[in-house]
């Protein structure tokens, strides 16, 4: 394939250029790409998925109750709800702003709700870059914040020492946890 660049995120470009292979080798995530039919060497978009879950018992009562409203009593006893994590998603620079990102998200959601899917999952999960455009993109595609505030989100995750320092300074997180119910 021709070299891929999303043009605005060197970390993302580097991931798909070099790290995606190691992620697959160590079963940390699986990357896929969409290519042009008329030119299969031209990559339109790339994404990486892996299994994940959300610990519902760690959530506040209002969020937990909202997520549980459609679950049966038997399901409520689960401490974790399985999901598919969209770990990375990027559209090639020349195709940006044309709806391809939304098409990829729609594809991923549909891929995991068909009867012959390989992984049971109730949720699509993303740890989205804490950027206004990125967060708005996921909201437009049906995702909601797992936590209303970053402070609540800091409490949910296991903080590294650097994140603990940010939390103490009330600094923003670099990412925000979001989810979409696939039912």
Please identify what each model-predicted range represents.
Residues 1-98, 102, 106-125, 129, ...:
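Non-catalytic substrate-recognition and accessory regions of acyl/acetyltransferase enzymes
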């Amino acid at each position: 394939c021709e070299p891929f660049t999303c043009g605005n995120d060197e970390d993302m470009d580097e991931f798909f250029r070099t790290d995606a292979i190691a992620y697959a080798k160590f079963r940390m995530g699986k990357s896929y790409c969409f290519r042009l039919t008329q030119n299969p060497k031209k990559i339109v978009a790339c994404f990486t998925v892996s299994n994940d879950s959300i610990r519902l018992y760690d959530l506040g009562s209002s969020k937990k109750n909202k997520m549980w409203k459609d679950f049966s009593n038997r399901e409520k006893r689960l401490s974790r709800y399985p999901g598919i994590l969209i770990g990375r998603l990027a559209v090639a620079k020349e195709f940006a702003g044309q709806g391809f990102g939304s098409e990829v998200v729609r594809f991923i959601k549909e891929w995991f709700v068909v009867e012959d899917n390989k992984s049971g999952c109730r949720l699509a999960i993303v740890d989205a870059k804490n950027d206004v455009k990125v967060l708005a993109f996921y909201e437009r595609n049906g995702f909601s914040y797992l936590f209303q505030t970053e402070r609540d989100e800091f409490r949910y995750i296991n903080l590294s020492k650097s994140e603990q320092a940010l939390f103490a300074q009330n600094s923003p997180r670099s990412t925000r946890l979001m989810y979409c119910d696939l039912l």
